Amino acid sequence: MSNNIPAELKYVASHEWLRLEEDGTITVGITHHAQELLGDIVFVELPEVGANLAAEEQAGVVESVKAASDVYAPIAGEVVAVNEDLPSAPETANSDPYGAGWFFKLKPANVADYDSLLTAEQYAGEVD
């Protein structure tokens, strides 16, 4: 599997990645492929902590020199944290999309939803 699609994460076709954390929360960000398509990211709008999001509901916005794109909640849940550093350093979503460039954390409404998402191999098939 490519370094650009880490095998330990889950994915959705709208180019968000998810990581199940030890505390049961799910960290969400945009994929390497998404940041490549967008180009240099210049603005990020994140959801409010405490917001209850439905699966596939718009959770934020990312703007680049090329385009603006919505960021979606891959599964239903409550936003329990946002990456406070991202709005002042949106380029982090380009340079470290799977690390410091994460967007928000969800407390999933149903953690089993995580298991039904795309594997790295399946997501790679979506973007090839």
Swiss-Prot record:
One Gene Ontology biological process: glycine decarboxylation via glycine cleavage system
Disulfide bond sites: none
Domain Lipoyl-binding: 25-107
UniProt-listed Pfam families: GCV_H (PF01597)
Modified residues (N6-lipoyllysine): 66
The UniProt record lists the keyword Manganese: no
Cofactor note: Binds 1 lipoyl cofactor covalently.
UniProt KW keywords: Lipoyl
Subunit architecture: The glycine cleavage system is composed of four proteins: P, T, L and H.
Known function: The glycine cleavage system catalyzes the degradation of glycine. The H protein shuttles the methylamine group of glycine from the P protein to the T protein.
Family assignment from sequence similarity: Belongs to the GcvH family.
Name of this protein: Glycine cleavage system H protein
Native species: Neisseria meningitidis serogroup B (strain ATCC BAA-335 / MC58)
Gene name tied to this protein: gcvH
